[in-house]
Design a protein with these regions (language model features):
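Amphipathic alpha-helical segments at domain termini/boundaries
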Residues: 1-45, 148-152, 191-303, 307, ...
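Conserved catalytic cores of soluble enzyme domains
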Residues: 2, 107-246, 355, 359-447
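Charged, low-complexity, helix/coiled-coil-prone segments
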Residues: 2-16, 53-65, 133, 158-159, ...
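Extended N-terminal export/anchoring regions of large proteins
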Residues: 4-12, 20-22, 48-55, 62-64, ...
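Generic, ordered loop/turn and secondary-structure boundary motif
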Residues: 23, 55-58, 93, 99-102, ...
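A structural preference for short, pocket-lining loop segments at secondary-structure junctions
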Residues: 31-38, 58-107, 117-137, 159-163, ...
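Small-residue-centered hinge/linker elements
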Residues: 34, 38-48, 57, 61, ...
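Short secondary-structure boundary/capping segments
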Residues: 51-52, 97-105, 153-154, 219, ...
């Protein structure tokens, strides 16, 4: 059996994990600083056929990274800055594992790159919207996707040891463009001159030391003897810019309760029914029922069971499962069940408590989950039927779709209706920073 056959018959990818199961990352929290240390297990690849040498990564590495960052968001809200570094000698991260890519199908590579992109975008999203800052403490060679991970952080500190360099060697070595935002972030985020960026992307060995700083490829450099102190100083400076409450108390995030069978995924708030003959899946999101906790104390007591948070976690896991494990299901039908008034009441609770850290992080998870639908490479159709609750936050589900079909019952008092609210006007911006209403109607003032 060859590596490609192994990949085709491999078990389902599971996006649920926890720190006790990590093989590649370690998470350490001290006060308002969290440290994520990369020490990728060479023999811990998600699929057979390759070894994760030189801190190169595959999907399993990024699943752990995403889980760790999410735990910092919810279990450690006192953390104001995350330091990303490496435990390997003279190696920070060498990027995506080339042998993994070589034995992977095109669809696998698409899903892999999409998830790694979303994970790095999530770092920037949390920095911009929620005040969680990130420092890349680059203590060794930093190439390809490793540099793209560093680029997603707020600042990059490079060790000046005469050998460690940052590089994007994909073009000269592989004849492909960097796949996780490297080119865009080098020019648009770090404002590297275009001529220097051109040179940088054709230099296999990369750029190190003072030149890397002069070219704006990193923010600062430090000699090995001063590196630890420089990391601490940079972390303290970034923490001072954070809006997160250093006295906040976190909640516990446990494994999702779900049942996965051949043609069905069942969560507490989301159900996915698969019709293989039609190559389509129906996502049904259940709206909130009853009154929600409406004070910071009550919301905190509800924890992971707070409906908007629980729904976001269920929906996100369902999306990731379907994207990765059901490649032949090309059409997703999006439905909702519930009372539109209850959804708008939920949004009122979120609006009234938007300064409370758990509500802010819940809105952030919803924002990132809706963005996953925006780029899921499937045909998405929203079906607005009797009993639907496409209102406010849940209307965003329909607005992420390619098309929206509304059952017309003009003479029926119980005809389905949609409703907009405050949530649809800026809570969940797309990658373009527009609301989905703005994007759908191209910012028209009137219909």
């Amino acid at each position: 059996m060859n590596a490609m056959t192994d990949l085709a018959t491999a078990p389902r990818v599971n996006y649920q994990t926890n720190p006790e199961q990590y093989q590649h990352w370690s998470l350490k929290v001290e006060g308002n600083v969290a440290t994520l240390t990369a020490d990728f297990n060479e023999d811990g690849g998600l699929r057979p056929g390759y070894k994760l040498k030189l801190n190169s990564y595959d999907l399993g590495v990024d699943i752990e990274l995403y889980d760790a960052v999410n735990r910092i968001r919810f279990e450690h809200p006192q953390v104001q800055v995350v330091v990303v570094t490496s435990a390997k000698d003279r190696i920070f991260c060498s990027g995506a594992n080339i042998f993994m890519l070589g034995v992977s199908s095109h669809a696998w590579k698409v899903n892999f790159c999409k998830f790694t992109n979303e994970t790095r975008n999530g770092l920037e999203d949390s920095s911009t919207h929620d005040g969680l800052k990130f420092l890349a403490a680059v203590n060794g060679a930093c190439a390809g996707g490793g540099y793209e991970l560093a680029l997603a952080c707020d600042e990059i500190l490079l060790i000046d040891d005469r050998s460690s360099a940052v590089s994007l060697p994909e073009v000269p070595l592989l004849g492909v463009l960097p796949g996780t935002g490297g080119l865009t972030r080098v020019t648009d985020k770090r404002h590297v001159r275009h001529d220097l960026a051109d040179i940088f992307c054709t230099v296999t060995e990369g750029i190190r030391g003072q030149k890397a700083k002069d070219w704006r490829l990193v923010d600062d450099i430090a000699k090995p003897a001063q590196f630890a102190n420089a990391v601490a100083e940079k972390a303290a400076a970034l923490a001072a810019k954070s809006t997160r409450d250093a006295a906040a108390k976190g909640i516990r995030i446990t494994e999702l309760k779900r049942e996965i069978t051949e043609n069905r995924l069942v969560y507490n708030t989301v159900t996915v029914d698969i019709d293989r003959a039609k190559r389509q899946a129906t996502f049904t999101v259940k709206g909130p029922q009853g009154a929600l906790p409406n004070t910071p104390e009550a919301i905190h007591a509800a924890g992971e069971n707070f409906y908007p948070l629980a729904m976001a976690r269920d929906l996100e896991d369902a999306i990731l499962n379907m994207r990765t494990n059901e490649l032949d299901i090309g059409t997703w039908l999006i439905k909702t069940e519930g009372d539109p008034k209850a959804v708008l009441a939920m949004d009122a609770v979120l609006a009234a408590n938007k300064d409370f850290w758990l509500v802010r992080e819940t809105i952030g998870l919803l924002r990132r989950t809706f963005s996953r639908l925006d780029v899921s490479s499937r045909s998405l159709f929203a079906l607005i039927e009797k009993g639907s609750c496409f209102a406010g936050t849940l209307l965003e589900l329909a607005l992420t779709c390619d098309r929206i079909y509304h059952l017309a019952l003009p003479d029926d008092a119980d005809a389905p209706r949609i409703a907009t609210g405050e949530a649809n006007h800026g809570w969940y911006p797309m990658a373009t920073e527009q609301s989905r209403l703005q994007r759908r109607f191209y910012e028209e003032a009137e219909p």
